[in-house]
Amino acid sequence: MVLRSEILTKKSELPTPDQALPGRESAMPVPEAHFVNGRPLTAPFPAGLQQVLFGMGCFWGAERRLWQQPGVWVTAVGYAGGYTPNPTYDEVCSGLTGHSEVVLVVYNPQETSFEQLLKVFWEAHDPTQGMRQGGDIGTQYRSVIYTFDAAQKAAAMASRENFQAELAKAGYDRITTEIADVPPFYYAEAYHQQYLAKNPNGYCGLGGTGVCLPA
């Protein structure tokens, strides 16, 4: 049996459900409005909008990159893909929840395409690094795409193959990005929401490979 203390020293290994922290029933309180555009952070969202969860390292820089994209209606940061319900940031950073730091992207498909958002996703980080992103090491920094329907999932998987071909030409390893149906999403604490808009000189570890995804 692997103990929780051993997981803490192995930042590259996900916990099992039995090892994960128990969490709590109550959800994290979040601001009503996006700090940048004033739109609601939580559902229900206007009819016709679509959603996706992207994880590409520390969610501060990832969220800023995504809210800046044309056609993105609102963004929020949180945790997904693990076992612990309603985790805190410290719990996620412990490696004992199984969650990844993710950005909820709500977008208008009449103003941008899912394929365009995938291009931003692949080019904005290094998806070959496994349980880390640059100097940020831990399972919470793994690369993930959590999709809301079959069409999104198929498009994400096709784009992964296309980007893998381009990365191979540049000498990069295999993509480690997880692509899966959307799991429960838990909003992060209020101070994490739109963090780099509130703290313009704050830490941003986002960095791509320089490889482009062909149109």
UniProtKB/Swiss-Prot annotation:
One GO biological-process annotation of the entry reads: protein modification process
Query: Which reactions appear under catalytic activity for this entry?
Result: L-methionyl-[protein] + [thioredoxin]-disulfide + H2O = L-methionyl-(S)-S-oxide-[protein] + [thioredoxin]-dithiol; [thioredoxin]-disulfide + L-methionine + H2O = L-methionine (S)-S-oxide + [thioredoxin]-dithiol
Q: Which UniProt keywords apply?
A: Oxidoreductase
- Coiled-coil regions listed in the entry: none
Q: Which residues form the active site?
A: C58
- EC code(s) of this entry: 1.8.4.11
Entry-linked InterPro entries: Met_Sox_Rdtase_MsrA_dom, Met_Sox_Rdtase_MsrA_sf, MsrA_MetSO_reductase
Q: What class of enzyme is it?
A: oxidoreductase
Listed GO molecular functions? L-methionine-(S)-S-oxide reductase activity; peptide-methionine (S)-S-oxide reductase activity
Cellular component aspect of the GO annotation: cytoplasm
Say which domain of life the source belongs to.
Bacteria
- The UniProt transmembrane annotation reads none
The entry sums up its family as follows: Belongs to the MsrA Met sulfoxide reductase family.
Function description: Has an important function as a repair enzyme for proteins that have been inactivated by oxidation. Catalyzes the reversible oxidation-reduction of methionine sulfoxide in proteins to methionine.
Q: Which PANTHER family does its entry note?
A: MITOCHONDRIAL PEPTIDE METHIONINE SULFOXIDE REDUCTASE (PTHR42799:SF2)
User: Which named protein is this?
Assistant: Peptide methionine sulfoxide reductase MsrA
Write the gene name.
msrA
